């Protein structure tokens, strides 16, 4: 089964870029959402009330954390 990864990022975010690069290197299917273009901060806080850093990454709609959490799972 292919898991769906969603990366909620923002402009000028090195760890957002690293998360996308990791997905591409590993051949993982992902969707990238950009702050203000694709979602608002309020919408993100509804999904992850204690989000403090970017990116916020979800696998199959479940929040897993940030880049280092993705790297632990797929690095």
Label each PLM-derived region with a short phrase.
Residues 2-28:
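Local sequence-structure signature of Cys/Sec-based thiol-disulfide redox active-site neighborhoods
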Residues 14, 39, 65:
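Short alpha-helical
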Residues 30-32, 63:
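Conserved beta-strand scaffold positions in the cores of enzyme catalytic domains, especially
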Residues 34-51:
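Thioredoxin-like thiol-disulfide oxidoreductase module
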Residues 48-58, 67-68:
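Structural micro-motif
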Residues 59-75:
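Non-catalytic, surface beta->alpha helical segment in thiol-disulfide oxidoreductase systems
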């Amino acid at each position: 089964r292919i898991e769906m990864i969603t990366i909620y990022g923002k402009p000028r975010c090195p760890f957002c870029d690293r998360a996308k690069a990791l997905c591409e290197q590993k051949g993982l299917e992902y969707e990238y959402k950009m702050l203000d273009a694709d979602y608002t901060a309020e919408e993100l806080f509804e999904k992850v009330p204690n989000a403090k850093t970017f990116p916020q990454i979800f696998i199959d709609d479940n929040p897993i954390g940030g880049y280092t959490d993705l790297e632990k799972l797929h690095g």
